[in-house]
A protein has these predicted regions:
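Long C-terminal interaction/binding lobes of large macromolecular proteins
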Residues: 1-10, 20, 124-197
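Short, conserved DNA-binding cores of transcription-related domains
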Residues: 1-74
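Feature targets compositionally biased, intrinsically disordered low-complexity regions
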Residues: 9, 17, 38, 47, ...
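Intrinsically disordered, low-complexity regions
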Residues: 19, 28, 40, 87, ...
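Short, positively charged, Gly/Tyr-enriched micro-motifs
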Residues: 59-144
Length: 197
């Protein structure tokens, strides 16, 4: 399982820190007990070029579950950084999928896959992002139209509400979305943590 850790570090800073990156000890999402550090694993992340990054693992002593602690710029199961994926999704919803792929220097098939996953999950994401607005004490904007556009609008409203409450430390829109979905914005078999509640 993966947990998204909201960090202000950029990809380059995180990579340069290596094993010295200061990852906090988190509570187990399953049983809420404190976890202990349980090593690292290497994973590639592409932002223009692919580079190896170390990801911290933590293990719960109570339920024995282990979790990868992904920095907020890293999406679960995706090679590309969330800061690359998110703007491409926005461009695709606007009908510019091929242009988005060309601008990013990525294969069209990669960008098309992101769109397919986002479209498949759009209703669930729209509901979750609207629920986040309510939880943050913000009004839910009028949501109508295609599910993908509704999901983007609800995400924007939730992000603005979070920034009003907590300030710029919330990070940019797509890091916020990645954290809110537990890294599962585009996963195939795993839903965001809030989807079952």
């Amino acid at each position: 399982m993966a947990i998204v850790w909201p960090t202000a570090l950029g990809v380059e800073q995180y990579a340069a820190a290596g094993r010295n990156v200061d990852v906090p000890r988190l509570g187990c999402p399953g049983c809420k007990e404190p976890m202990s550090f349980w090593g690292w694993y290497e994973r590639d992340l592409r932002v223009g070029r692919s580079q190896p990054l170390l990801v911290r693992r933590q293990r719960c002593r109570t339920c024995a579950a282990s979790h990868a602690v992904l920095p907020s710029f890293m999406a679960h199961g995706r090679l590309d950084a969330i800061g690359v994926i998110g703007p491409a999704l926005e461009a695709m919803v606007a009908g510019h999928a091929r242009r988005a792929a060309d601008a990013l220097g990525l294969p069209y098939t990669t960008v098309r896959d992101w769109r397919r996953r986002f479209v498949a999950r759009a209703e669930m994401l729209a509901i979750g992002f609207a629920r986040a607005c309510v939880a943050l004490g913000a009004p839910v904007p009028r949501l109508s139209g295609e599910a993908v556009a509704v999901a983007l609008k609800a995400l924007g409203a939730a992000w603005r509400a979070a920034r009003r409450r907590w300030g710029p430390g919330v990070g940019h829109l797509w890091r916020f979305a990645n954290g809110l979905t537990g890294g599962h914005l585009l996963t195939t078999n795993i839903n965001p943590p809030w989807s079952s509640t």
